[in-house]
Amino acid sequence: MNVKKHKFPGVYTVIEDDGSERIATKNLVPGQKVYGERIVKWKGEEYRIWNPNRSKLAAAILNDLKNFPIKPGTTVLYLGIASGTTASHVSDIIGWEGKIFGIEFSPRVLRELVPLVEERRNIVPILGDATKPEEYRALVTKVDVIFEDVAQPTQAKILIDNAKAYLKSGGYGMISIKSRSIDVTKEPEEVFREVEKELSEYFEVVERISLEPYEKDHALIVVRKP
C-alpha cells in the first residue's frame, strides 16, 4: 500500500496492494470513524477512505473534477449537512484553521451530528431552513465556499440567496443537482442546463460534472461569485 498527495490540497490517493486507487482524507480526529468508513494507517498518519457511493463530493473528485475550492483553512457554509458524512471529510481537509457552518432543517438528523461535532470543533451545527438565509444571520460569517446538497425544486435559488448573504466576492459555490427533485418529467440533461442558466444570472458557471455511476441523474455544478 502507498499514500500520495492528490492534486487537491488535503485530499490523498491511497494505492492498494492490487494497484486500485481510492481517495482519502487525513483523519483530523485519529480513531474516530463517522459512517463506518475504512481507516488506513501509513507512516504514522491515519487516513479515512472517502466513499463516492456515500458522498457526492467524492464522486465528483473521482470523476475528474477540475475545480475544488475547499482547502486547508477554508470557511464553508454547508447547506443540508445531514448527519455529516461528507462534512466530516471537509472537516479533515480544512483543518482546525477552517470552519464549517452546517445548516440542517431536520432536528432529528441534526441530533445525529452531535457526536461528530463534539470531537470536531471546526463544525458548527445550525438548525435552520436553507430557503430562509436571514434566519441564521447571527450565527454565520462571510464564507469562502458554499456547498449545497438540498434536494428541492428551488435548489438554484437557495444557492443564490445564500451567496448574496454570506459568500465573499470571488468565492465559490458547489451545488449537487438531483434532476428528479427539480422536474421528473424532463431529461436530466435538460434540467441541468436550465439550472446552469438560472445560476449564470448571478454567478460565473465554472464547471459541471456528472456523478454517474455513483449517483444516478445527478450532477455537481461549480460556480464563482464575481
Swiss-Prot record:
Keywords: Methyltransferase, RNA-binding, rRNA processing, Transferase, tRNA processing. Its EC number is 2.1.1.-. S-adenosyl-L-methionine binds at T85, T86, E104, F105, D129, A130, D149, V150, A151, Q152. Disulfide bonds: none annotated. Pfam families: Fibrillarin (PF01269). GO terms for biological process: box C/D sno(s)RNA 3'-end processing; tRNA processing. Gene3D superfamilies: Phosphorylase Kinase, domain 1, Vaccinia Virus protein VP39. It is an enzyme of class 2 (transferase). InterPro entries: Fibrillarin (IPR000692), Fibrillarin_CS (IPR020813), SAM-dependent_MTases_sf (IPR029063). Coiled coil: none annotated. SUPFAM superfamilies: S-adenosyl-L-methionine-dependent methyltransferases (SSF53335). GO terms for molecular function: histone H2AQ104 methyltransferase activity; RNA binding; rRNA methyltransferase activity. Interacts with nop5. Component of box C/D small ribonucleoprotein (sRNP) particles that contain rpl7ae, FlpA and nop5, plus a guide RNA. Belongs to the methyltransferase superfamily. Fibrillarin family. Involved in pre-rRNA and tRNA processing. Utilizes the methyl donor S-adenosyl-L-methionine to catalyze the site-specific 2'-hydroxyl methylation of ribose moieties in rRNA and tRNA. Site specificity is provided by a guide RNA that base pairs with the substrate. Methylation occurs at a characteristic distance from the sequence involved in base pairing with the guide RNA. PANTHER family: FIBRILLARIN, RRNA 2-O-METHYLTRANSFERASE FIBRILLARIN. This is Fibrillarin-like rRNA/tRNA 2'-O-methyltransferase. It comes from Thermococcus sibiricus (strain DSM 12597 / MM 739). The lineage of its organism: Archaea, Methanobacteriati, Methanobacteriota, Thermococci, Thermococcales. The gene is flpA.
